[in-house]
Amino acid sequence: MQNQIISLSRSLIQRKSISPNDEGCQQLIAERLQAVRFKLEWLPFGDTLNLWATHGEGEPCLAFAGHTDVVPEGDESQWTYPPFSAEIVDDMLYGRGAADMKGSLAAMVIACETFVKNNPNHQGKIALLITSDEEAAAKDGTVKVVETLMQRQEPIHYCVVGEPSSTKQLGDVVKNGRRGSITANLYIEGIQGHVAYPHLAENPVHTALPFLSELTAYQWDNGNEFFPPTSLQIANIKAGTGSNNVIPGELYVQFNLRYCTEVNDEIIKTKVAEMLRKYGLKHRIEWNLSGKPFLADNGKLVQATIQAVENVTQITPKLDTGGGTSDGRFIALMGAEVVEFGPINQTIHKVNECVNVNDLGKCGEVYYQILCSVIPN
C-alpha cells in the first residue's frame, strides 16, 4: 500500500487547499472510491465541500474522518522546498498538509480501498467523512454532516480520525478523547473620564481586578484518571482609547477554558456569573462552546487500535486526551466511539512541514488492521 499512499499524498499536497477551499482534493478521492463501488454523497454547506462515502450496509458503521483543507503556508521564502511541491528528500515528504493531514487521509483512503477489494462482501458499513472546513471556522464541515446523519438516523458506531496524534515516533500516542473548549467574551462597564478627576469616573480595569484575580486562581477540579485538571487562560484583554489621560469606559476580557469531564459548560457559566455578582460588576458576557469533552474508554475500537499499532510499530501506544480540539468532538455527539491516530505532529502548521514516507505506509497498515478487527468479513 505504501507506494499508493505516497502517490495520493503527493497529489493532495500539490493542491493548494487553504481552508475552506478544497481545490479538487475530494474529487480526486471520490474517483478512487467510486472505482471500488463506494456510494458517494456530496454535502456542501456554505463555502465548504463535504464528502460522505460509504461501502456496505447495516451495522457496525466504522467511519474514517479527515480534512482536505490546510492552514496558510506563511512566508514561502522560509521553506526549504516549495510548500505545495510535495518533494521527497531522504524519505521525508515535504509540504503544507503533509502531516496535518493529507498524508493520513491518503492512508485511510488506500486502506479502505484495499479492504473492500479483499472483502467485497463484508458485513457492516465502511465510511469516509471528508471535509474542507477543519482548520478555520469549523462551522460548515463535519458538524453539519453529523447533523445531517443524525436527522436521518444514520449512525456511526466507531470512528478513526486521522489527526497527527504521534509525538516522537509513530504510534507512541493514540488520542481516545479530548477536553471541552469554551470561550467567554466579557465586557465590563465603567464610566469614561479624565484621569485627573477619578471621582467623576469609574475605571472598569480597577473594579475588575479582584474578579480577575479570583477567576484566574480558581481551581475548577482536580482532573481524573483520563483528563488533566480544567485550565483557564486569559487570551485577550483591552481597554482605553490609547491616550494617557482618559479613564476607559469599558474593559474587554476574552478567556478560554479547556475543561475535563468533572465539570460541564453550565457549571462553568454559573460559577463565572456568581463571581461577577460577588464583585457587583456591570457587564455583558457572550459564551461560545466550541466542543464538549469526550472519552472513548476501553472499548472495541480503542483495543483494536492499540493492537494494530503494536502489530505494525512494535510499540504500545499511550492513551491521551491532551491537546486542542478536533472534529472528533462532533462525531462523539452521535454516541460513536472515537479515536485519533496519525503521523508525528512535530512539524504541523510550521515551515517545512513534513512526514516520513515509511510512517505513512505504516499508518495505512494500522488503518487496514483496524478495519479487519472491527468490520466482520
From Swiss-Prot:
Keywords: Amino-acid biosynthesis, Cobalt, Diaminopimelate biosynthesis, Hydrolase, Lysine biosynthesis, Metal-binding, Zinc. One of its GO terms (biological process) is L-arginine biosynthetic process. Binds 2 Zn(2+) or Co(2+) ions per subunit. It comes from Glaesserella parasuis serovar 5 (strain SH0165) (Haemophilus parasuis). Pfam families: M20_dimer, Peptidase_M20. The active site is at 69, 134 (proton acceptor). Homodimer. GO terms for molecular function: acetylornithine deacetylase activity; cobalt ion binding; succinyl-diaminopimelate desuccinylase activity; zinc ion binding. This is Succinyl-diaminopimelate desuccinylase. Its EC number is 3.5.1.18. Belongs to the peptidase M20A family. DapE subfamily. It is an enzyme of class 3 (hydrolase). SUPFAM superfamilies: Bacterial exopeptidase dimerisation domain, Zn-dependent exopeptidases. PROSITE patterns: ARGE_DAPE_CPG2_1. Zn(2+) 2 binds at residues 100, 135, 349. Zn(2+) 1 binds at residues 67, 100, 163. Its cofactor is Zn(2+); Co(2+). Pathway: Amino-acid biosynthesis; L-lysine biosynthesis via DAP pathway; LL-2,6-diaminopimelate from (S)-tetrahydrodipicolinate (succinylase route): step 3/3. The keyword Hydrolase applies.
